[in-house]
Amino acid sequence: MNNSAFTFQTLHPDTIMDALFEHGIRVDSGLTPLNSYENRVYQFQDEDRRRFVVKFYRPERWTADQILEEHQFALQLVNDEVPVAAPVAFNGQTLLNHQGFYFAVFPSVGGRQFEADNIDQMEAVGRYLGRMHQTGRKQLFIHRPTIGLNEYLIEPRKLFEDATLIPSGLKAAFLKATDELIAAVTAHWREDFTVLRLHGDCHAGNILWRDGPMFVDLDDARNGPAVQDLWMLLNGDKAEQRMQLETIIEAYEEFSEFDTAEIGLIEPLRAMRLVYYLAWLMRRWADPAFPKNFPWLTGEDYWLRQTATFIEQAKVLQEPPLQLTPMY
């Protein structure tokens, strides 16, 4: 099965309910789809009126060993009292299989959206990220990848070269902007950072608030620098971002030491995410869910804006990185 061409067309509601029934769960409500394009995720209620979420993993994106490492990390975090949505075990197994689909069941954790402009909530998130990384430092992922230039820049560049989605009249300018951005990132990238296990996709949309933060969706967990789990929480102008980052770091360091030299990786990581995200959309284009939800990807205006975004980010990389106040 080719990962890029795979679709979830054969994953019918009956298939999902049969998979759950095999493990003793009777669905007593409808299956409510949750917002996930990479996997298929549904919320439901069982006959005891308990709410769960079932996640069916996209085949061939992660191996069984890689998914199990994600689950083991989540369970270690829960054991260390870090608020994370961790999978439910059935006869000691968290990774289940039905008709070739890997899936896992999680307790449904409700909550409000994390308020990225709420400094008190930001402080609490920083504190728990410090605890998360305290656990993350105990060992590394063996099977899951480490953040690096090849996965985030070099492989996407090859994909762009062969892509038919990019309008022919705009492709040369887009590839030139991509190459300049890759060169700028490469010039500012460093690999002497301390590597630890990360959430990997720690942005406001993956944090719920219930008298404190609840971290969800470890699907992108991998090894990398601590700052990867911090920078996506920053928003606003540079002064606001400085205050937010100082708040996070001060709370974070109650549990884990933070190397402030990693602040210089924020803009390279932002650039890498821009490139990687676009490549992800293009790899998934054969899945009908993607043209339906991202129709603008075929428009010339989008590629003009994307080219401009890459050019602007390359310029940002030439500027000094975010500076903390002297006390740091």
UniProtKB/Swiss-Prot annotation:
Catalytic center at which residues? 201 (proton acceptor), 217
A single GO BP term for this record reads: response to stress
Q: Where does Mg(2+) bind?
A: 206, 217
| Gene Ontology cellular-component terms listed | cytoplasm
Concerning InterPro entries, the annotation shows: Aminoglycoside_PTrfase, Kinase-like_dom_sf, SrkA/RdoA
The record lists the effect of residue 217 to A as:
Loss of kinase activity; does not protect bacteria against hyperlethal stress
Q: Which HAMAP family match?
A: SrkA_kinase
Q: What does this protein do?
A: A protein kinase that (auto)phosphorylates on Ser and Thr residues. Probably acts to suppress the effects of stress linked to accumulation of reactive oxygen species. Protects cells from stress by antagonizing the MazE-MazF TA module, probably indirectly as it has not been seen to phosphorylate MazE, MazF or MazG. Probably involved in the extracytoplasmic stress response.
Instruction: Output this protein's name.
Output: Stress response kinase A
Q: Can you name the source organism?
A: Escherichia coli (strain K12)
Name the gene for this chain.
srkA
